[in-house]
């Protein structure tokens, strides 16, 4: 009968890691299987969430030829399955050849851990093959290679089998093949070596992901491959292309163009390194104090050691490294670097948004774009803070701790720290992923609860009309109860996470403390070493308590940063051609020659539009809504590029000159004037930001609004409110006219500038506009035909075509569309609409 003895072959909890010309089998088969299982679980955690986010393939069908190469993939599956069975076969071989010998406990643990690690590898192999076929079925191009986690697992497995060769001369291993047991174990090692080597080589080739040929059959009614790509992209894993994201992020770490800030970055990195040294030195001096007290050392030595310890503790802080002098100094110095980074990101985004076309802006919600900008900026600074000053230092502390305990204590202490930290990180990631759904549900319900309250209060009068106060309170109570139920789940899952972390910390501390106590009892370590171990481990676990928060925040920030970079990748539709020069303005002759334009493919907004505006002339564009009148102005201002034809100013194609020079010669008074939430003076000065106060007032006088401005309590310093809502329609139009007068453009574009005003305001503003347009080339879009009767030329536009042109009298005598429009408007002016009659408001 075979029984289980001590964990290792030696007496006591553990023996040395290196003994008898080789690694201790106990140490080796504890380190390797635990490392492999850690890598396998981490790889699964990173891949499986992405699998859940994948969209199932639709009606597309993937031909067999596009599938994986069958024979190599079957071999890969066979080797992965064999690798899973070999550890258990090795344990069975040990049991069969033991014959009354008590088996050490590490053999049982190693067999279980190795098998579980192989299960993770086999699972990943199948999952990635399924994802590859699904991606091909959706017409999404992918790189035919395994995930980094799976490749790393196979690489470390093969490297571990090679590592065993360093113990070739050790009698503890099976290399001598002295008996049946060693012969069996040697044969199993050969199988493991061949298996792991085969998986490593096949993994680099990835036959399960590489198609023989790319043949995609799609049903005719579902040939929108682009749509599938969009869906796939929107659901991509947060950790996908991690290397590219880190490279993009690192570009913001180094403040280019600022030597002083670059020096500060180096100082901050140096301080971060000093913090790592302090985290080692503080427990060491604490150990020395305990040893000196135990040995009853002289007061001078004790006082010096205590003073040094307290000074180091002052530099380090209250045990966590987050409140000490060094950390606070680093935080203080980093403020300028963080501001430089956020300023650079914000300005880059803001500048890019202004470079994008009007078409892009009209197709996006401004609030959504601004959220991307805000979150993108915060994500860059947040990721730099979390990664550089939280995650990397914590991982560095773990590595330093493993190296320190392995070198100055025993390799088993390093192994204990490694196992506990690995288990801690894995469980934190797994539980954090699990509880994410509770947090999402809670946030959704919180928004719904708030929306219900807001909706009820906004409809206060309606609630009173129907006496529904009790009903609204009941609905709100129901929403609160539902929110609190989800809040309980989220909080309870957080408690589970904290208790799981606490359990791992306790188990690690228990194992290390027992081992340390054993070595102290054997007089291999001192009492101070026991204190050092407990202090160092507790200090090490402190920042790890926030690892779950860091993990979620990094995920969120990566998503926000990805959205920001997607925004930066938006192509600028209207660009200056290479070598474009400024517009050379002479007299202001405008020519449209055979212009075609469409906002969307297949729907032409303008068709073969041709006309000429001579210098100083006024041309009016009239016609029904949607005919293309405003489009003509936008094309002249070059908000869009035309599909075909040519637009010239003084004989120069506007697509061949710089946009800024073109627009500097054009002034626009739109139908709906939007003012900035600023003073009246600054809104007028926006026409020419370098203008002085006297020039602003002169422009206001020319626009006929100077006296009205002076009647305000604060005069020109009056705030107009958001979008100018504190001013009347006529006042806003006059501010827009004053702004255009101050710009002093050579060409004026009036887009139904008075259509929304009453008759008295319209006449007054028409007089102001007449002054602005004197001796300037002008194009007017008019809704009321009476405002353009004196135009040099009137163009009647319908369905994107010019159907009539001429002066007012000639068009009336022709009896066409213009004459019909004129007659209808004259009849409308003679009849007072019912809505305009005075109403009894009593």
UniProtKB/Swiss-Prot annotation:
The protein's induction, as recorded, is: Up-regulated during erythroid differentiation and heme biosynthesis. Up-regulated by cellular porphyrins (at protein level). Up-regulated in red blood cells under anemic condition. Induced by sodium arsenite in a dose-dependent manner.
* Cysteine pairs bridged by disulfides in the record: 8-26
UniProt cross-references to PROSITE patterns, sorted A to Z: ABC_TM1F, ABC_TRANSPORTER_1, ABC_TRANSPORTER_2
Query: Is-annotated flag, keyword Membrane?
Result: yes
Identify the residues that bind ATP: 599, 623-634
- For the Lumenal compartment, the record's topological domain ranges are 1-26, 94-106, 169-185, 285-291, 397, 521-529
Record-linked SMART domains: AAA (SM00382)
Q: Where in the cell is it found?
A: Cell membrane; Mitochondrion outer membrane; Endoplasmic reticulum membrane; Golgi apparatus membrane
Q: What are the transmembrane regions? A: 27-47, 73-93, 107-127, 148-168, 186-206, 264-284, 292-312, 376-396, 398-418, 500-520, 530-550
Q: Where is this region: Required for the lysosomal targeting?
A: 1-205
Catalytic reactions of this protein: coproporphyrin III(in) + ATP + H2O = coproporphyrin III(out) + ADP + phosphate + H(+); coproporphyrinogen III(in) + ATP + H2O = coproporphyrinogen III(out) + ADP + phosphate + H(+); heme b(in) + ATP + H2O = heme b(out) + ADP + phosphate + H(+); pheophorbide a(in) + ATP + H2O = pheophorbide a(out) + ADP + phosphate + H(+)
Q: Does the keyword Zinc-finger apply?
A: no
Spans within the Cytoplasmic topological domain: 48-72, 128-147, 207-263, 313-375, 419-499, 551-842
Name where it mostly resides. membrane
What does the record say about the knockout? Answer: Homozygous knockout mice for Abcb6 gene appear phenotypically normal. In a ferrochelatase-deficient mouse model where Abcb6 has been homozygously disrupted, mice exacerbate porphyria phenotypes shown by increased porphyrin accumulation, and marked liver injury.
Using the record's annotation, list all stretches that form the ABC transmembrane type-1 domain: 265-556
> Which GO molecular function entries does the Swiss-Prot or TrEMBL record give?
ABC-type heme transporter activity; ABC-type transporter activity; ATP binding; ATP hydrolysis activity; efflux transmembrane transporter activity; heme binding; tetrapyrrole binding
Q: What mutagenesis or variant effect is reported for residue 170 to G?
A: Results in retention of the protein in the Golgi apparatus
Going by the UniProt record, its keywords in alphabetical order are: ATP-binding, Cell membrane, Disulfide bond, Endoplasmic reticulum, Endosome, Golgi apparatus, Lysosome, Membrane, Mitochondrion, Mitochondrion outer membrane, Nucleotide-binding, Secreted, Translocase, Transmembrane, Transmembrane helix, Transport
- Describe the location of the ABC transporter domain by residue ranges: 590-824
Subunit structure, interactors included: Homodimer.
UniProt family annotation: Belongs to the ABC transporter superfamily. ABCB family. Heavy Metal importer (TC 3.A.1.210) subfamily.
Record-given protein name: ATP-binding cassette sub-family B member 6
Organism of origin:
Mus musculus
| Organism placement in taxonomy | Eukaryota, Metazoa, Chordata, Craniata, Vertebrata
The record's gene field reads Abcb6
């Amino acid at each position: 009968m075979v029984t289980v003895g001590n964990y290792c072959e030696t007496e006591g909890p553990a023996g040395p890691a290196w003994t008898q010309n080789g690694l201790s089998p106990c140490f080796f088969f504890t380190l390797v299987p635990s490392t492999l299982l850690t890598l396998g679980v981490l790889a699964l955690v990173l891949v499986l969430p992405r699998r859940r986010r994948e969209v199932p393939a639709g009606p597309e069908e993937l031909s067999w030829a596009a599938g994986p190469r069958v024979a190599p993939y079957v071999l890969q599956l066979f080797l992965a399955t064999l690798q899973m069975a070999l550890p258990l076969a090795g344990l069975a071989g040990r049991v069969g050849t033991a014959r009354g010998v008590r088996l050490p406990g590490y053999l049982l643990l190693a067999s279980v851990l190795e098998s579980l690690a192989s299960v993770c590898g086999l699972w990943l192999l199948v999952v990635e093959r399924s994802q590859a076929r699904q991606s091909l079925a959706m017409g999404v191009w992918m790189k035919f290679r395994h995930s980094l986690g799976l490749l790393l697992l196979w690489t470390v497995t093969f490297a571990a089998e090679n590592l065993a060769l360093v113990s070739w001369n050790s009698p503890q291993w099976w290399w001598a093949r002295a008996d049946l047991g060693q012969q069996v174990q040697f044969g199993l090692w050969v199988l493991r070596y061949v298996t792991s080597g085969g998986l490593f080589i096949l993994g680099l080739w990835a036959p399960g992901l590489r198609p023989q040929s790319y043949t995609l059959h799609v049903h005719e009614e579902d040939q929108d491959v682009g749509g599938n790509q969009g869906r796939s992209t929107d659901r991509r894993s947060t950790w996908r292309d991690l290397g590219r994201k880190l490279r993009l992020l690192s570009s913001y770490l180094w403040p280019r163009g600022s030597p002083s800030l670059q020096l500060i970055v180096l100082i901050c990195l140096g301080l971060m390194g000093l913090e790592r040294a302090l985290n080692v030195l503080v427990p060491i001096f604490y150990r020395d104090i305990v040893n000196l007290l135990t040995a009853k050392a002289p007061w001078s030595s004790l006082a010096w050691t205590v003073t040094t310890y307290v000074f180091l503790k002052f530099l380090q802080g209250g045990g966590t490294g987050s409140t000490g002098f060094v950390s606070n100094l680093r935080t203080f110095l980093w403020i300028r670097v963080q501001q430089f980074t956020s300023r650079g990101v914000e300005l880059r985004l803001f500048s890019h948004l202004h470079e994008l076309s009007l078409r892009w802006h009209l197709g996006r919600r401004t609030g959504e774009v601004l959220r991307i900008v805000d979150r993108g900026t915060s994500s860059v600074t947040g990721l730099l803070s979390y990664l550089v000053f939280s995650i990397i230092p914590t991982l560095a502390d773990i590595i330093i701790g493993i190296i320190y305990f392995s070198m100055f204590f025993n390799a088993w202490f390093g192994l204990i720290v490694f196992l506990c930290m690995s288990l801690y990180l894995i469980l934190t990631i797994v539980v954090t992923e699990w509880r994410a759904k509770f947090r999402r549900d809670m946030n959704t319900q919180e928004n719904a609860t708030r929306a219900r309250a807001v909706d009820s209060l906004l409809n206060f009068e309606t609630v009173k009309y129907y006496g529904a106060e009790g009903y609204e309170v009941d609905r709100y109570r129901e929403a609160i109860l539902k929110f609190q139920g989800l809040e309980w789940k989220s909080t309870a899952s957080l408690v589970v996470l904290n208790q799981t972390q606490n359990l791992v910390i306790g188990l690690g501390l228990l194992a290390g403390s027992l081992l340390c106590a054993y070595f102290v009892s054997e007089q291999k370590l001192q009492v101070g070493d026991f204190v050092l171990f407990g202090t160092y481990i507790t200090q090490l676990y402190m920042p790890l308590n926030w690892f779950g928060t860091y993990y979620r925040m990094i995920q969120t920030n990566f998503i926000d940063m990805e959205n920001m970079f997607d925004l930066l990748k938006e192509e600028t539709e209207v660009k200056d051609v290479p070598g474009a020069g400024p517009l050379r303005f002479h007299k202001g002759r405008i020519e449209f020659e055979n212009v075609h334009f469409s906002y969307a493919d297949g729907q032409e907004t303008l068709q073969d539009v041709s006309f000429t505006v001579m210098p100083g002339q006024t041309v009016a564009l009239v016609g029904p809504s949607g005919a293309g009148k405003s489009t003509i102005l936008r094309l002249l201002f070059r908000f869009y590029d035309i599909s075909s034809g040519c637009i010239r100013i003084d004989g120069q194609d506007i697509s061949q000159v710089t946009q800024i020079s073109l627009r500097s010669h054009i002034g626009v008074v739109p139908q709906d004037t939007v003012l900035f939430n600023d003073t009246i003076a600054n809104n007028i000065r926006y026409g020419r930001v370098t203008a002085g106060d006297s020039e602003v007032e002169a422009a206001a006088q020319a626009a006929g609004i100077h006296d009205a401005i002076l009647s305000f309590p604060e005069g020109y310093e009056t705030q107009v409110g958001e979008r100018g809502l504190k001013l009347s329609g006529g006042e806003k139009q006059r501010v827009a006219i004053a702004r255009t007068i101050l710009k002093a453009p050579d060409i004026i574009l009036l887009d139904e500038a008075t259509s929304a005003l009453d008759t008295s305001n319209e006449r007054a503003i028409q007089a102001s506009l007449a002054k602005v347009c004197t001796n300037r080339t002008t194009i007017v879009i008019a809704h009321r035909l009476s405002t353009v009767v004196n135009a040099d030329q009137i163009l009647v536009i319908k369905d994107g075509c010019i159907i009539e042109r001429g002066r007012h009298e000639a068009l009336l005598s022709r009896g066409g569309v213009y004459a019909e429009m004129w007659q209808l408007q004259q009849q409308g002016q003679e009849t007072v609409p019912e809505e305009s009659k005075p109403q009894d408001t009593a």
